[in-house]
């Protein structure tokens, strides 16, 4: 079962799950797990990794919130989805920057996932931009 398929089956979606948002939700879910794992691994390192741990845990929480809101299709809350996509994008970029400061393999993988998630959020944003 995939997030995209589940969303497509929602009665209010009529078979159009918003592919970009579905991908962003899926990768934000993965990003949350990787950030949590990276924070845990950082806590076992001998170096002072407090800022990296904080960045990873903040990113995990934002990604989880974005995923939960993005998969809801009953009613509309376009402004909230847009704000969460923007926040997720920014938080993932900040977390990636922090992880890239460290040479640990878990930080490298976390940074890669954060960059991918940020790109997915960026791709999903146009459907939620304010009309000019």
Regions found by a protein language model. Give the residues of each.
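Amphipathic alpha-helical hairpins
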Residues: 1-132
């Amino acid at each position: 079962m995939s997030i995209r398929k589940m969303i497509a089956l929602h009665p209010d979606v009529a078979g159009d799950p918003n592919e970009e948002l579905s991908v962003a939700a899926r990768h934000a879910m993965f990003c949350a797990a990787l950030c949590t794992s990276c924070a845990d691994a950082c806590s076992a390192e001998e170096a002072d990794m407090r800022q990296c741990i904080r960045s990873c845990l903040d990113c995990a929480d934002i990604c989880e919130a974005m995923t939960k809101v993005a998969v809801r299709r009953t009613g509309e809350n376009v402004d909230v989805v847009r704000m969460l996509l923007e926040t997720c994008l920014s938080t993932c970029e900040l977390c990636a920057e922090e992880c890239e400061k460290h040479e640990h393999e878990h930080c490298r993988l976390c940074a890669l996932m954060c960059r991918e998630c940020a790109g997915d959020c960026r791709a999903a944003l146009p459907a939620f931009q304010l009309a000019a």
